[in-house]
């Protein structure tokens, strides 16, 4: 752009809307690419001059926008329809699997993402006062891969109840008797995707800290445990909980390292144990 703003040209928000420059899905993909490169180059101690160039380009990417009804926009133009229940949530890539938007670091954008996700689930616009239930998530939203993606999105946005509803939705509407997931034909995306989404409900590490139980529903809270989960930075995590509270955890790595840990609502710095 003449003012130096960088946009991906001639993009398309997958299977939805017109082709144009600066589609949010494309912008978010490039932001993630630049962020991943910058962190990898810094860790390896390489490409110092090129790191500066990439950081400058990242800073000039056209940013995410909040639209007229509070939604995270899908395009540069504010044309999102609050009653659109399209199956894709491509403009929420920055929430999951990306990491540009988070509750703690970008709360205004996270709130806008929640509004956009409610809209795609049929819980905004003319249905804004309709309770969010499994049954209200209808029509185009019932796909093998849609339930897991939205489960992971709700987990990243800290809503364990809605994340849990997405698991139940996949089992109720898009799982065959042999446990293959359907689109309605067989589609493996749902089987693979839901395991990743469940992991996001139990452990997150995308925002510079390890968070235990970020989004568990009430019916999981009584008692539970997980072992051997992996977190960014090469950490292995074990965890037990009772009544929604972590009562035990272990963090392992190749060598003892300090790490930020969010547990039971408290952020602390702990030292990992050496893997044996």
Kindly label every feature range from the protein language model.
Residues 1-2, 8-10, 14, 115, ...:
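Primarily short, surface-exposed interaction patches in extracytoplasmic proteins
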Residues 2-3, 91, 232-233:
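Short, well-ordered loop/turn elements at secondary-structure boundaries
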Residues 7, 60, 74, 94-96, ...:
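Generic structural signal for residues positioned in beta-strands
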Residues 161-275:
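Non-catalytic C-terminal accessory modules of carbohydrate-active enzymes
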Residues 1-8, 46-50, 212:
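Short, glycine/acidic-rich hinge or "gate" loops at secondary-structure transitions
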């Amino acid at each position: 752009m003449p003012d130096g703003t960088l946009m991906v040209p001639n993009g398309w928000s997958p299977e939805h809307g017109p082709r144009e420059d600066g589609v949010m899905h494309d912008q978010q993909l490039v932001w993630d690419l630049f962020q991943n490169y910058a962190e990898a180059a810094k860790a390896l101690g390489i490409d110092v001059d090129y790191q500066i160039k990439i950081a400058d380009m990242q800073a000039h990417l056209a940013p995410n926008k909040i639209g007229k009804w509070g939604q995270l926009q899908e395009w540069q133009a504010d044309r999102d329809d609050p009653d659109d229940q399209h199956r894709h949530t491509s403009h929420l890539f920055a929430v999951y699997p990306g990491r540009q938007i988070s509750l703690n670091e970008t709360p205004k954008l996270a709130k806008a993402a929640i509004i956009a996700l409610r809209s795609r689930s049929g819980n905004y616009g003319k249905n804004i006062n309709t309770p969010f239930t499994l049954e209200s998530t209808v029509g185009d939203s019932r796909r093998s891969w849609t339930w897991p993606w939205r489960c992971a999105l709700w987990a990243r946005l800290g809503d364990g109840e809605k994340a849990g509803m997405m698991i139940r939705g996949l089992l109720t509407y898009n799982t065959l008797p042999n446990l293959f997931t359907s689109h309605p034909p067989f589609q493996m995306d749902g089987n693979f995707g839901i395991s990743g989404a469940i992991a996001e409900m139990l452990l997150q590490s995308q925002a510079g800290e390890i968070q235990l139980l970020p989004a568990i529903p009430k019916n999981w809270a009584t008692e539970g445990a997980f072992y051997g989960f992996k977190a960014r930075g090469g950490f292995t995590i074990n965890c037990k909980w009772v009544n929604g509270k972590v009562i035990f955890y272990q963090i392992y790595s190749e060598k003892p390292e300090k790490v930020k840990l969010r547990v039971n609502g408290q952020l602390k710095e702990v030292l990992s144990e050496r893997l044996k």
